[in-house]
């Protein structure tokens, strides 16, 4: 079920769970760019310069937050697994029917986008940003630093450190 409000839109997965999303249709014969967050991401990362620039050139945009991210409702007892996140993305795309979607995934969002395509989503394109890094000492350091930064300064510090240009 979709509910549109003047400021926010929600896709209801069931009575107790919903995803926050923002969807603007293209104004020309252009695709819709669908943004898939990193685990620490949210719609506001995409809706600033990137989203405004795309919309100014006639592209549609669709950004949303995973369960557990800002403005979503979710069952805290439910395991937020990658499969669940991909299933939610597929359901949201089926409900919103974006025109010629181009999936753009940041970090693990790129993996979720690719898995959605593997599971039948018809996409006009796929863009991966900083996705699927090789495991090793550098990635271990990044993961540990991310955890420590979140403990020290919360989500805002993490966004400043990990996605300052978005």
Regions found by a protein language model. Give the residues of each.
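Flexible "cap/lid" loop of the alpha/beta hydrolase fold
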Residues: 111-118, 122-153
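Histidine/lysine/aspartate-rich catalytic loop segments that bind and position anionic ligands
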Residues: 158-166
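The conserved SAM/SAH-binding core of class I Rossmann-like methyltransferase domains
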Residues: 62-64, 106, 129
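Active-site loop/oxyanion-hole signature of alpha/beta-hydrolase fold enzymes
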Residues: 48, 60-102
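Conserved HGGG/HGGXW glycine-rich cap/lid loop of the alpha/beta-hydrolase fold
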Residues: 17-74
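N-terminal cap/lid segment of alpha/beta-hydrolase-fold proteins
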Residues: 2-19
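Conserved alpha/beta-hydrolase "nucleophile elbow" surrounding the catalytic nucleophile
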Residues: 37, 101, 105-107
């Amino acid at each position: 079920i979709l509910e549109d409000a003047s400021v926010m839109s929600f896709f209801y997965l069931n009575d107790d769970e919903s995803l926050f999303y923002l969807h603007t249709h293209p104004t020309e014969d252009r695709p819709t760019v669908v943004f898939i967050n990193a685990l620490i991401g949210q719609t506001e990362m995409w809706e600033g310069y990137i989203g405004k620039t795309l919309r100014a050139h006639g592209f549609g945009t669709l950004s949303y937050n995973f369960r557990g991210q800002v403005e979503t409702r979710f069952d805290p007892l439910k395991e937020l697994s990658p499969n669940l996140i991909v299933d939610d993305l597929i359901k949201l795309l089926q409900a919103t029917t974006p025109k010629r979607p181009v999936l753009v995934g940041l970090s693990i969002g790129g993996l979720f986008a690719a898995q959605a395509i593997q599971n039948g989503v018809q996409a006009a394109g796929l863009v991966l940003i900083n996705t699927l890094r090789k495991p090793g000492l550098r990635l271990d350091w990044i993961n540990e630093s991310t955890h420590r930064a979140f403990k020290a300064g919360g989500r805002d510090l993490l966004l400043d450190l990990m996605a300052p240009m978005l």
